[in-house]
């Protein structure tokens, strides 16, 4: 019988804009030994407003910084969970890059896909735009529609969290799911 060990898990926070990825990630970080690496915060720290492009190249660059930071944290054993936030992970290549990274470091991974109705997501986005509460200035209803149209389905194992069902129930679901992955036998 193989003993179950609790090992670090890199978590992809996937979902359309406004579906609650950051809210769920922050709530999980309060409950678990976790670090949240937010692409939008990283971009804002690296680039002055006039240098922010919201381009695929800049997003991919920031994702690589997230992964380098994750490798550093994993090497220091400073977090059991690394939550990758601030990117929709709407494209397969984005998710595959994270899975490749995890394979290279022999680290477990999980995908949490946040979902909600279009009306709720758009209302959240409109509120954030009006109040200027999000670091990504391109995070608008138009971006939601653009990403939804080009979304590539997630074929990997995942937990779908309906963020309309209340934060506590979604976080509880995610906590149980992540604990199972962290304790799987090798």
Which ranges hold each PLM region?
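Phosphate-binding P-loop
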Residues: 2-8
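Hydrophobic anchor at the beta1->P-loop junction of P-loop NTPases
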Residues: 13
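The conserved Walker
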Residues: 17
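Conserved phosphate-donor/acceptor-positioning beta-strand/loop module used by diverse small-molecule
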Residues: 103-125, 161
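Small-molecule kinase domains that catalyze NTP-dependent phosphoryl transfer to phosphate-bearing small molecules
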Residues: 130-173, 181-186
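Glycine-rich phosphate-binding loop used to anchor ATP phosphates in small-molecule kinases
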Residues: 60-105
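Conserved glycine(s) of the Walker
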Residues: 20
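Conserved substrate/cofactor phosphate-moiety recognition/catalytic segment
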Residues: 23-78
């Amino acid at each position: 019988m193989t003993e179950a060990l609790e090992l670090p898990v890199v978590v992809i926070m996937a979902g359309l804009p406004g579906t609650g990825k950051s809210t769920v990630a922050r709530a999980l970080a309060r409950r678990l030994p976790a670090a949240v690496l937010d692409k939008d915060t990283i971009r804002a720290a690296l680039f002055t407003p006039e240098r922010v492009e919201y381009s695929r190249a800049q997003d991919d660059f920031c994702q690589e910084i997230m992964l380098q930071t994750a490798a550093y944290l994993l090497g220091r054993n400073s977090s059991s969970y690394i939550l990758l936030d601030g990117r929709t992970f709407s494209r397969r290549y984005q998710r595959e890059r994270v899975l490749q990274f995890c394979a290279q470091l022999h680290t477990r991974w999980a995908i949490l896909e946040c979902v909600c109705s279009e009306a709720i997501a758009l209302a959240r986005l409109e509120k954030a735009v009006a109040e200027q509460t999000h670091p990504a200035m391109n995070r608008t209803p138009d971006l939601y529609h653009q990403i939804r149209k080009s979304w590539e389905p997630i074929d990997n194992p995942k937990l779908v969290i309906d963020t309309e069902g209340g934060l506590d129930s979604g976080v509880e679901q995610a906590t149980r799911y992540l604990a199972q992955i962290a304790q799987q036998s090798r």
